[in-house]
Amino acid sequence: MLVISIVATILVSCTTETENGGFSLEKVNDTLYNVVLETDSSRDVWELRFPVYRFCTGDMDGDSIVDAVVGVEKTTRFDPVVRRRVFMFRNIEGKVRPLWMGSRLGRPVVDFNVVNVDGETRLRSVEEDDNGKFLVAEYRWSSFGVKFIRYICRDFEFDDSMEILNNE
């Protein structure tokens, strides 16, 4: 149980809210994680049967309720290659429910973070560009899924892109 607590603490480090909205991540084993939502009166779990590389929280859809953003490594029906994907979950009356189960962003995802830009919560990602270099892009929620906003940088080396992701 101590290992679960340590993993959750490390992965929650990109939280943009002062509180995580009751969301946390429990590692059961290398390929089984639980997105957990705890309120004063209930505990709900959404099982993820994939490796998780990132866990963040923030009000992604602008409804003033904190959402969970989870990076998973998996295939999809239309892409048989294991890649990094981004899933979003919301709190519906104390239950964990999918908000968006994204198969990809603009380019293959390397990593992401949840950031606050001028009072708006956004998804910021490092993606691998077609030329083998890396870019940092920003997305916002748009009715069903995320909408591209802007490139923060393009044609950067991996380390430089990750530094921008983690320091802005």
Language model: regions and residue ranges:
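Beta-propeller-forming repeat regions
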Residues: 13-168
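Bacterial N-terminal signal peptides
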Residues: 1-10
